[in-house]
C-alpha cells in the first residue's frame, strides 16, 4: 500500500494539488524517440526504424514514474508518405496509462532545394487510464476521493509539422489535442479529480560538421508546455492548474558516424519544477543497424533530498542502414 503523504509528494510532481492534472512522460534521449511527440516524424529516416526505451524516474522513491515506449515508423513506396506506430506504458503512483497510436505523415519539398522538406503529420490514438486509488493508505477510509478505482478509455488525435534538411530541423506538434476529465460523472464535485492535459512541443536542432562527417556537433532543444490553451482551474483557489513550461537544452557530438555522446539541461521557464536536472547520455550505432543508448539524469531540484537520480536505456534497429550511411548520413 502506498502511504498518502508520500503519494501526494510524488504525484504532485506530475500533477497539481487539488487535481490529478497529468502531463506527458519525458525522455532524455528524445532525439531517438521523436515519434512519441510528433507524428510528422513518421518516415523521415527514409527506412524502417524501430526504437524501444525504458525510463526509471527518481530511483528509490516509492511511486515514482516508470515509462516504456515502443516506436516504429517507415516511408511507404510512395516516398512522400510515412506511417508510424507507437505504444507507451506509463506508471506513476496509483495511476497508469497505456497508449496506442498510429501516425500518418505527408512530406513535400520546400523551395528549389530537394534537401529541404516539410512533413505534416496526423495521429489517432486510444489510451487506457487507470487510477488504482484503493492502493493508497489514508487517514479517513471513507474519503470519497479514494473509495474506488477508475478505468477510462480515452480516444484522441494529434497533429504535427516537421521541417528538416541535412543539417537542421524544426518541429511543432500536439500529439493529443483532446483533454479528458478522468473523473466519473457521478463523483462528488468536491472530491479529488483528475484530468489529462494537452501538451504542445517545439523542437529544433542543427548538425555542424567539424571534421567532415567524422566529427559532428549537434545542439538541440525541446520545449514542452502542458495545459496550453486550457481553462482547468483548482476548485479551491481558482488558480489555473498545469505543469510549468519546461525546456531541454542539449549538445552532442557524433564521432565517426557511430558514437553519440551528449549532455543536456532540463528546467522550467516559469514557476517551479521538480524536473530540473543535468543529463548525460551516450548511444552506439553498429554498422549492422543496431543502436544502444543510455542516459543518466542528475536531479537538481529539491526532490533530490528524497530520491536518487534517474536513468534511461534504449535499443533501436534501422533497416538498410549501410546504404543510407553512405548516401545520406542522418543526424536527427
Question: Which residues make up each language-model segment?
Answer:
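Absolute protein N-terminus
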Residues: 1, 21-22
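Bacterial N-terminal signal peptides that target proteins for export
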Residues: 1-7
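Short helix-onset patch at the extreme N-terminus, typifying the N->h transition
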Residues: 7-8, 27
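N-terminal signal peptide c-region/cleavage motif recognized by signal peptidases
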Residues: 16-17
Amino acid at each position: 500500500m502506498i502511504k498518502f503523504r508520500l503519494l501526494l509528494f510524488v504525484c504532485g510532481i506530475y500533477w497539481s494539488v487539488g487535481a490529478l492534472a497529468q502531463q506527458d512522460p519525458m525522455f532524455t534521449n528524445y532525439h531517438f524517440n521523436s515519434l512519441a511527440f510528433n507524428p510528422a516524424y513518421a518516415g523521415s529516416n527514409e527506412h524502417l526504424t524501430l526504437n524501444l526505451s525504458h525510463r526509471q524516474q527518481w530511483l528509490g522513491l516509492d511511486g515514482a514514474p516508470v515509462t516504456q515506449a515502443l516506436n516504429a515508423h517507415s516511408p511507404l513506396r510512395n516516398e512522400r508518405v510515412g506511417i508510424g506506430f507507437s505504444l507507451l506504458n506509463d506508471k506513476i503512483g496509483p495511476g497508469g496509462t497505456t497508449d496506442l497510436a498510429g501516425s500518418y505523415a505527408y512530406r513535400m519539398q520546400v523551395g528549389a532545394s530537394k534537401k529541404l522538406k516539410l512533413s505534416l503529420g496526423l495521429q489517432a490514438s486510444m489510451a487506457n487510464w487507470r487510477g488504482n486509488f484503493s492502493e493508497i493508505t489514508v487517514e479517513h477510509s471513507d474519503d470519497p476521493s479514494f473509495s474506488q478505482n477508475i478505468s477510462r478509455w480515452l480516444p484522441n488525435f494529434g497533429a504535427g509539422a516537421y521541417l528538416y534538411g541535412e543539417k537542421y530541423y524544426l518541429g511543432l506538434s500536439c500529439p493529443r489535442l483532446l483533454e479528458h476529465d478522468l473523473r466519473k460523472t457521478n463523483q462528488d464535485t468536491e472530491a479529488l479529480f483528475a484530468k489529462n492535459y494537452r501538451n504542445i512541443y517545439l523542437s529544433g536542432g542543427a548538425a555542424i560538421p567539424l571534421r567532415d562527417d567524422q566529427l559532428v556537433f549537434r545542439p538541440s532543444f525541446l520545449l514542452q508546455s502542458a495545459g496550453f490553451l486550457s481553462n482547468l482551474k483548482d476548485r479551491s483557489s481558482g488558480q489555473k492548474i498545469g505543469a510549468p513550461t519546461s525546456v531541454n537544452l542539449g549538445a552532442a557530438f557524433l564521432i565517426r558516424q557511430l558514437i553519440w555522446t551528449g549532455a543536456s539541461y532540463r528546467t522550467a521557464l516559469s514557476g517551479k519544477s521538480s524536473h530540473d536536472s543535468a543529463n548525460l547520455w551516450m548511444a552506439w550505432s553498429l554498422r549492422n543497424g543496431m543502436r544502444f543508448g543510455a542516459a543518466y539524469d542528475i536531479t537538481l531540484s529539491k526532490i533530490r533530498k528524497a530520491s536518487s537520480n534517474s536513468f534511461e536505456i534504449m535499443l533501436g534497429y534501422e533497416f538498410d542502414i549501410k546504404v543510407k550511411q553512405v548516401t545520406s548520413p542522418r543526424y536527427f
